[in-house]
């Protein structure tokens, strides 16, 4: 599994994980040209639920069928807890509050376009 960070226009640093091929293959090699799938988790979740069971996981089944799987993480979850200019772990409550002021609108406006642009640049 590969781990990448991408930046949003409003400063969040989010994480995306990639599984370009089945277990035991050299990661990153041969992924170019494969069909890309972005699997985005739902509300109050993270990417881990996508690949939690090797036998029944849709994500791993897609990888085994030849897809280049990318798993997005929403801002402010355990895998995407960074920001370019706001400190997450600060004693200043006004700074911490600003970091946590997030909405689905922001995720749609900033996170998804940045994520798609990142994936498209990586898979050209």
What are these regions (language model features)?
Residues 1-4:
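Short, hydrophobic/aromatic-rich segments at coil-to-beta transitions
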Residues 90-123:
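Alpha/beta-hydrolase active-site loop
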Residues 15, 20-88:
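Short, surface-exposed "cap/lid" segments of acyl-processing enzymes
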Residues 9-11:
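Glycine-centered tight beta-turn/hairpin loop motif at sheet-sheet or coil-to-beta transitions
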Residues 7, 19-21, 92:
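Intrinsic-disorder/low-complexity, polar/charged segments
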Residues 7, 34, 53, 98, ...:
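Intrinsic disorder
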């Amino acid at each position: 599994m590969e781990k990448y960070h991408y930046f949003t226009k409003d400063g969040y640093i989010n994480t995306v994980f990639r599984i370009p091929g089945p277990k035991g293959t050299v990661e990153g090699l041969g992924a170019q040209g494969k069909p890309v799938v972005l699997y985005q988790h739902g509300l109050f979740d993270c990417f881990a639920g996508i690949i939690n069971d090797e036998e029944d996981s849709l994500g791993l089944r897609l990888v085994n069928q030849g897809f280049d799987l990318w798993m997005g993480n929403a801002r402010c979850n355990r895998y995407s807890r960074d920001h370019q200019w706001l400190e997450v772990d600060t004693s200043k409550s006004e700074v911490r509050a600003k970091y946590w002021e997030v909405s689905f609108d922001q995720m749609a406006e900033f996170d998804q376009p940045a994520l798609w642009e990142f994936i498209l640049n990586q898979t050209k």
